[in-house]
């Protein structure tokens, strides 16, 4: 336990909401097999998306039975939803999980088939107060040159600001950013 606590101080390990240990931000890009080029290329695009939408932006990579935040950008002011880099989140809820499910990268059974079809046809998933009360998000897939989903770009913030539909509110900007 003392070693794990020391590793937590250096961001090698972090604790989940349930108290379990998981990889921390210092190791996140290694464990996800993420190319440092993806994170480097995403940075300016994510900052522009924050400037355009005024909301928090995250980049997720599929890591086994969770999704891991591999990059995040926050607005300079206002109420934000922060996901620390290295955080592992469930694939049973949320707009990013829907994107992974829509493109058959995970078991999509938690989500209605018609919602997944909409994600595939529109290129955007949304979630309102699903993972956390008061939180809403919209997510879009990032494809590699072979047409495979390699990551998911998300915009998240207070549900009230993203009402009535996060996808309608930020979807156009989000899809454009995910294609860059």
Predicted regions and their residues:
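Short loop/turn motifs at secondary-structure junctions and domain boundaries
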Residues: 51, 129-135
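A structural signal for short hydrophobic beta-strand segments in well-ordered beta-sheet cores
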Residues: 13-14, 59-60, 142
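Short, ordered coil/turn segments that flank beta-strands lining enzyme active or ligand-binding pockets
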Residues: 17, 63, 145-146
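Juxtadomain coupling helices with adjacent low-complexity linkers
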Residues: 108-117, 121-125, 133, 151-180
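N-terminal helix-turn-helix
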Residues: 1-36
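A short, hydrophobic, proline-anchored segment that marks a local hinge/packing element in signaling
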Residues: 138-145
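Amphipathic alpha-helical effector-binding/dimerization core
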Residues: 22-107
């Amino acid at each position: 336990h003392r070693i794990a606590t020391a590793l937590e101080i250096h961001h090698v390990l972090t604790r989940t909401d349930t108290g379990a240990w998981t990889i921390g931000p210092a190791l996140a890009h290694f464990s996800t097999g993420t190319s440092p080029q993806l994170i480097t290329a995403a940075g300016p695009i994510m900052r522009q998306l924050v400037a355009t939408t005024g909301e928090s932006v995250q980049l997720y990579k599929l890591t086994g039975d969770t999704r891991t935040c591999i990059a995040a950008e926050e607005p300079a002011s206002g109420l934000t939803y922060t996901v620390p880099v290295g955080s592992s989140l469930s694939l049973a809820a949320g707009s990013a999980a829907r994107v992974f499910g829509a493109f058959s990268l995970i078991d999509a059974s938690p989500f209605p088939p018609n919602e997944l079809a909409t994600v595939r046809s529109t290129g955007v998933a949304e979630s309102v107060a699903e993972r956390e009360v008061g939180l809403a998000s919209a997510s879009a897939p990032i494809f590699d040159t072979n047409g495979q989903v390699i990551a998911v770009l998300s915009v998240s913030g207070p549900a009230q600001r993203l009402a009535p539909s996060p996808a309608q509110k930020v979807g156009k900007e989000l899809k454009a950013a995910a294609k860059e």
